[in-house]
Amino acid sequence: MYNAPMAQDMSYYEHVQRRHEEKGCLYACIFTALCCFCCYETCECCLDCLCCCCN
C-alpha cells in the first residue's frame, strides 16, 4: 500500500483566503498589501489576491 502524503505548507493564496474567512475582507486586503510592502515588491500573487480577496 501507499503511505499517506506528507503534510504540506499552506500556499500564500490559501493563507489569504483563510484570513478572509476568519477575519473579513478588509483584514485580508491589508495582510496582502503588507506582504508586498515587507518584501519591497509587488508580485503577481499579491495582485491576484488583492483583486480576488473580496470575492
Swiss-Prot record:
| UniProt keyword Transcription regulation present | no
KW Transmembrane (keyword) present: yes
Give compartment(s): Cell membrane; Secreted, Cell wall
Q: What induces it?
A: Down-regulated in root tissues but up-regulated in shoot tissues in response to cadmium (CdCl(2)).
Q: Which GO terms describe its cellular component?
A: extracellular region; plant-type cell wall; plasma membrane
Give me the disulphide-bonded residues: none
Provide a Gene Ontology MF annotation, just one. metal ion binding
Identification of the protein by name: Protein CADMIUM TOLERANCE 1
Organism, scientific name: Oryza sativa subsp. japonica
Species lineage: Eukaryota, Viridiplantae, Streptophyta, Embryophyta, Tracheophyta
